[in-house]
Amino acid sequence: SALFLPMVLLGLHHGLIPIYAVQLEQMGGVSLFPVLSMGGAGQVGAAIAIYLVARKVGNKKMQGIITGALPAGFLGVGEPLIYGVTLPMGKPFITAGIGAGFGGAYIMFTQVMANAWGPSGLVAIPLMQGATGMLNFLIGLIIAYIGGFIVTKLWIKDSDVREEEENFETTNVEEKY
């Protein structure tokens, strides 16, 4: 799960679907999907940490981006947080992956299996096998949220989130040509 986000960037996560299908057929459930779902949860935790720092330093633009992208993140759509927040900042993209790793490790330890695959995040809870699987998946999400939050909070500084002053050239177009 810690390495899932770079796969998303490259679109390689779609290549895992045949593996899910083979697991479902041969094992009666999918073990890889619940683990990889933690990638988005790490993003959510990292984004919440960044939001708190952005509020502290007065970066309204970042607060707005996170506020708009966070609901989708909780529902398992991580791309708005990846492309709008963590990847442009750099370090939080890594810290989100580390947080995801904690949740993924818990999912593997508790052997959560899914009956199918689909969106990740909170909406994936009903896809897990049995009440225990659903509960452990939820606990894994919470661990990844908290892991992403803590690692990001420890790693970023106020200066990483402070809004940069915009410097636009005011050169007349006619002067250039």
What are these regions (language model features)?
Residues A2-H13, M27-V30, A72-L75, I107:
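Transmembrane alpha-helix interface/packing and boundary motifs in multi-pass membrane proteins
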Residues L3-M7, M38, P71, L138-I142:
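Hydrophobic alpha-helical transmembrane segments of multi-pass membrane proteins
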